[in-house]
């Protein structure tokens, strides 16, 4: 962030639109999907020594519906449905510091929130058989930290930059529900630390 000068203010927004045609043996369907990719801004706080950046970025999105109807012989007719919806979004803010002429140190704090629900339903046309449904819900509401370190050196018309980032792994909770009767919803389990973001580390060099 500190690479921007004292007169710089950057604002960036991006979106996407996807039009898709799906087809199988039973027919075709056209779908249009759009998404806000990110909104970010960046500006210096004090000359070229301290700079700030913030933004909103969707992290992931889920959206699908599949159905299948079949029968077991001529006596039992059933349908299966698979649904998924939701997503995660992260809001971040970051500071960077030029601690000397050739070293910069920075950190981003991310607030990630959202939920993803995936369900499976088996239903029968015969009233003597109960509908069975299972729903998995993953909810995230947590903070993450990512650190960065950068070394740079300039001589004449040449500049070499060496950088690295690190983020420790973060664990989240997961809830699972199962519905056995069409009118009864039972919580089977709530699992702590059942999902985690992996440790992140990386580096790069530019000339």
Placement of each model-derived feature along the sequence:
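Subset of outer-membrane beta-barrel
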Residues: 1-207
């Amino acid at each position: 962030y500190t690479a921007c000068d004292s007169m710089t203010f950057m604002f960036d927004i991006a979106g996407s639109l996807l039009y898709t045609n799906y087809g199988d043996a039973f027919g075709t369907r056209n779908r249009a999907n759009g998404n806000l990719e990110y909104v970010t801004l960046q500006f210096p706080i004090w000359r070229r020594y301290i700079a700030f950046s913030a933004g909103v970025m969707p992290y992931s999105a889920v959206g699908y519906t599949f159905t299948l109807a079949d029968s077991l012989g001529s006596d039992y007719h059933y349908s299966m449905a698979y649904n998924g919806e939701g997503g995660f979004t992260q809001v971040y803010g970051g500071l960077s510091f030029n601690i000397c002429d050739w070293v910069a140190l920075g950190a981003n704090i991310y607030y990630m929130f959202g939920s993803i629900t995936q369900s499976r339903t088996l239903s029968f046309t015969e009233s003597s058989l109960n509908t069975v449904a299972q729903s998995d819900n993953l909810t995230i509401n947590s903070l993450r930290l990512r650190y960065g370190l950068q070394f740079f050196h300039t001589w004449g018309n040449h500049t070499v930059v060496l950088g690295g980032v690190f983020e420790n792994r973060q664990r989240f909770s997961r809830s699972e529900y199962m519905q056995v009767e069409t009118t009864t919803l039972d919580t089977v389990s709530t699992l702590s630390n059942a999902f985690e973001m992996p440790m992140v580390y990386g580096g790069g060099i530019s000339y």
